[in-house]
């Protein structure tokens, strides 16, 4: 988590656990209610620092529930409006689900059943000090150009973003480049590649290369680096 601790949740109907990385110690976390557990299941770290997790009762049983862990109060609570807050419930078990933190800061949910794709909207907010920071980038970019370079810190984010277990990982610890038109507000994404590192250690200076779409209109744009749904400071660029 962004506070430097690890939130552990598993398949036993017991308390969750918190691992303090700096101290090397474990403490008990909250116990999920109603016999819920995560005998395989997805979780995602929200930009606000909370953890969204999918639970279900017992081993591979259906009737799932979605809960948030709040590290500030060491508590688990159902997502609003309640247990059936996702169209996948009640027919899903937790192991059906997958979560991914998307660039908007929302959490996208899919399963391998027939449920529609769902998007969870976390409470707005970003934990202080975790956002990417752009240090340098070209301020003039050609339409369709390739191998442009952006330098910054925290460009990979400070977390994997999404988690599951041994069967699946929805990692988003890599930089995206987002361009927002200052005249229309339309949003475009560049193709990023060849990052200098995939480290999520705070403060590391790194770079990523990016290719502009051939279809992006000319004009002034606010350029941001995005990781795990968290955008950086804006950098004004001219696209021609």
Where in this protein do the model-derived segments appear?
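Edge beta-strands of extracellular beta-sandwich domains
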Residues: 231-240
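Immunoglobulin-like IPT/TIG beta-sandwich domains and homologous Ig-like subdomains
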Residues: 3, 26-28, 36, 52-56, ...
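Residue-level detector of Asp-centered blade-edge/turn motifs that repeat once per structural unit
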Residues: 1-4, 45-48, 101-104
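Beta-propeller blade signature
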Residues: 15-23, 64-73, 117-122
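Blade-level signature of beta-propeller repeat domains, shared across WD40, Kelch, NHL, RCC1
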Residues: 93-130, 153
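Beta-propeller and closely related beta-sheet repeat lectin domains
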Residues: 39-43, 96-99
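Proline-enriched interdomain boundary motifs that mark the N-terminal boundary
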Residues: 26-28, 126-137
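Conserved beta-propeller blade signature
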Residues: 6-8, 51-53, 106-109
């Amino acid at each position: 988590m962004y506070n430097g601790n690890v939130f552990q949740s598993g398949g036993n109907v017991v308390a969750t656990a918190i691992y303090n990385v700096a101290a090397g110690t474990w403490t008990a976390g909250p116990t999920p209610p109603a016999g819920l557990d995560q005998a395989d299941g997805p979780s995602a770290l929200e930009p606000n620092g909370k953890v969204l997790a999918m639970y279900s009762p017992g081993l591979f049983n259906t009737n799932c529930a979605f809960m948030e862990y709040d590290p500030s109060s060491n508590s688990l609570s159902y997502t609003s409006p309640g247990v059936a807050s996702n169209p996948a419930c009640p027919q899903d078990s937790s192991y059906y689900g997958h979560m991914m933190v998307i660039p908007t800061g929302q959490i996208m949910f899919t399963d391998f059943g027939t449920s529609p794709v769902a998007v969870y909207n976390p409470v707005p907010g970003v934990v202080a000090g975790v956002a990417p920071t752009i240090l340098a980038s070209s301020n003039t970019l050609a339409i369709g150009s390739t191998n442009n370079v952006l330098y910054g810190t925290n460009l990979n984010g400070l977390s994997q973003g999404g988690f599951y277990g041994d069967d699946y990982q929805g990692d988003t610890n890599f930089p995206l480049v987002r361009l927002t038109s200052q005249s229309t507000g339309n949003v475009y994404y560049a193709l990023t590649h060849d990052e200098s590192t995939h480290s999520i250690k705070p403060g590391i200076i790194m770079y990523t290369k990016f290719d502009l779409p051939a279809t992006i209109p000319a004009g002034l744009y606010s350029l941001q680096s995005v990781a795990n749904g968290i955008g950086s400071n804006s950098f004004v660029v001219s696209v021609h």
